[in-house]
Amino acid sequence: MKIPEAVNHINVQNNIDLVDGKTNPNKATKALQKNILRVTNSSSSGISEKHLDHCANTVKNFLRKSIAAQSYSKMFSQGTSFKSLNLSIEAPSGARSSFRSLEHLDKVSRHYISEIIQKVHPLSSDERLLLSIIINSNFNFRHQSNSNLSNNILNIKSFDKMQSENIQTHKNTYSEDIKEISNHDFVFFGVEISNHQEKLPLNKTHHTVDFGANAYIIDHDSPYGYMTLTDHFDNAIPPVFYHEHQSFFLDNFKEVVDEVSRYVHGNQGKTDVPIFNTKDMRLGIGLHLIDFIRKSKDQGFREFCYNKNIDPVSLDRIINFVFQLEYHIPRMLSTDNFKKIKLRDISLEDAIKASNYEEINNKVTDKKMAHQALAYSLGNKKADIALYLLSKFNFTKQDVAEMEKMNNNRYCNLYDVEYLLSKDGANYKVLEYFINNGLVDVNKKFQKANSGDTMLDNAMKSKDSKMIDFLLKNGAILGKRFEI
């Protein structure tokens, strides 16, 4: 097992360069030109299948690199957090992003490696051994979702790409993430230490959150991925009582259970979240773990970490207790090398929010369940599922009346169907279907939330011009509260 000499050398920056292996930014371009020239020169004598595969892979790798450059350009140029930390770059002047953003990622990664090396240098023999174990460990990357993302091929798309393709599904990316770190063109993964003998996955939550009933696991990283030690936006490690494997630590250790809750950050304060490229990520994890162990007053925990025979599961427990590792792949992952593991059943509402048609069809087998499903669709503003259900089942006005009487659906308990059809963010196409097919009365006054209002009141409040125009054309009037 080999440890980079950088961790024990006095000249930190020089050795950072050794760890990173500074590359010629034109190397990929020159290699591509060389391969294209080779193909051109050999065209007269025929091209072997081996050469065709090589050329195809060269083009594929070039495209993958170009896409990654676009994702990083967006993140580093638009994220306000990077600007405040003086880690931003200028937005590309043209439509395409240059590879400069990838070079910037490497520079940022080297910066954070250098920063942590300066904190922990020099290492003891126990620390060197632990670092070597981490550096030589294999990782699994886990993406959880209630969506059905695979059919022999696993396809996971970033939030930004799904938006560009008008794909409607439950989102875990919010406006604050986009504004501050602008990493919404990446696919997110939890990280765990690979152990071929243990049942996968080792963890089922990330940052205390259960992101879905399906775990999609890959054992290969991306040359253009990046890792953070925590959730990139929320870098606070939660208290021990929120951890998935809390009993392991509460039963075995004392002081460390009170030490773990903290912000993980760099030298510029708690908003300074360390970022490591794929090449540096194991080194970054190991050095930051050593820094935490040094500060811990828990002797039992320290001895446990420095056990030379530590097994992969125990190492994973430590790393995902001290940190909450998050790995990010630019824009999209598409692979046939993966495992899909169902962790639990998916509720009907979660299946609807995730646009999981397979699960919906398995659960909605009669009109009674269709009532539930339609109510969940309207409550969650899932127009795609609502229109799908309306096309599959012959809904009548009586069905709508029965929906409103359901006492086991919170949306129907709190709201009239007319309110759900016209609330802020509702899709006017669904409203159009209901009115055109006589399923609701255009001027029925709400009996539950906002009692006395009508659908036109809701549309006016949200300033939905399409919905307002459609309602007015169908004779809609305002409710009593707005009458003069």
Curated annotation (Swiss-Prot):
State the source organism's domain of life. Bacteria
Which cellular component terms (GO) are annotated to the entry? extracellular region; host cell cytoplasm
Where is the protein localized?
Answer: Secreted; Host cytoplasm
InterPro entries referenced in this protein's UniProt entry, alphabetically: Ankyrin_rpt-contain_sf, OspC1-4
**EC number of this enzyme:** 4.3.99.-
Outcome of H328A?
A: In EH/AA mutant; abolished arginine ADP-riboxanation of host CASP4/CASP11
Which residue ranges contain the repeat ANK? 369-398, 413-444, 451-480
**Which molecular-function annotations from GO does this UniProt entry contain?**
ADP-riboxanase activity; toxin activity
| Record-annotated active site | E326
Q: What class of enzyme is it?
A: lyase
Q: Which residues bind NAD(+)?
A: H143, Q144, S145, N155, K157, T169, N172, T173
- Which reaction(s) are listed as its catalytic activity? L-arginyl-[protein] + NAD(+) = ADP-riboxanated L-argininyl-[protein] + nicotinamide + NH4(+) + H(+)
Stated role = ADP-riboxanase effector that inhibits host cell pyroptosis. Acts by mediating arginine ADP-riboxanation of host CASP4/CASP11, blocking CASP4/CASP11 autoprocessing. This prevents CASP4 activation and ability to recognize and cleave GSDMD, thereby inhibiting LPS-induced pyroptosis. ADP-riboxanation takes place in two steps: OspC3 first catalyzes ADP-ribosylation of target Arg, and then initiates a deamination to remove one N-omega group.
Q: Which family does it belong to?
A: Belongs to the OspC family.
State the name under which the record lists this protein. Arginine ADP-riboxanase OspC3
Q: Which organism was this protein described from?
A: Escherichia coli
Q: Which gene encodes it?
A: ospC3
